[in-house]
Amino acid sequence: MQLGQAIAQIRKERGLTQEAFAKMYNVTRQTVSNWENEKSYPDLSTLVKISDEFNVSLDVLLKGDFR
């Protein structure tokens, strides 16, 4: 699984809209959409925050072994 797909899955499993997810990380809804569609990627500090907030290891996020 790609990073964008993992972010989308995490967000959807928690019942969050792109807008709500964006507010958690001080970015726009369009930025979240771009992450999920792999047009851009979160910076490392944001990835760490996502990892901590949703209890998903960075290794899982980056290597694409999210289940």
Where is each model-derived feature located?
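Central "turn" residue of the DNA-binding helix-turn-helix
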Residues: 15, 25-26, 38, 55
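DNA major-groove recognition helix of helix-turn-helix/homeodomain DNA-binding modules
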Residues: 45-60
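Short, Lys/Arg-enriched C-terminal cap helix and immediately downstream tail that follows
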Residues: 8, 44-45
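Conserved hydrophobic/aromatic packing and binding residues within compact polymer-binding modules
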Residues: 7, 21-22, 32-35, 61
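Short, charged recognition helix plus adjacent turn
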Residues: 64-67
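Short coil turns linking two alpha-helices in DNA-binding domains
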Residues: 17, 28-31, 43, 57
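Short basic helix-loop element that most often maps to the first helix and adjoining turn
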Residues: 5-24
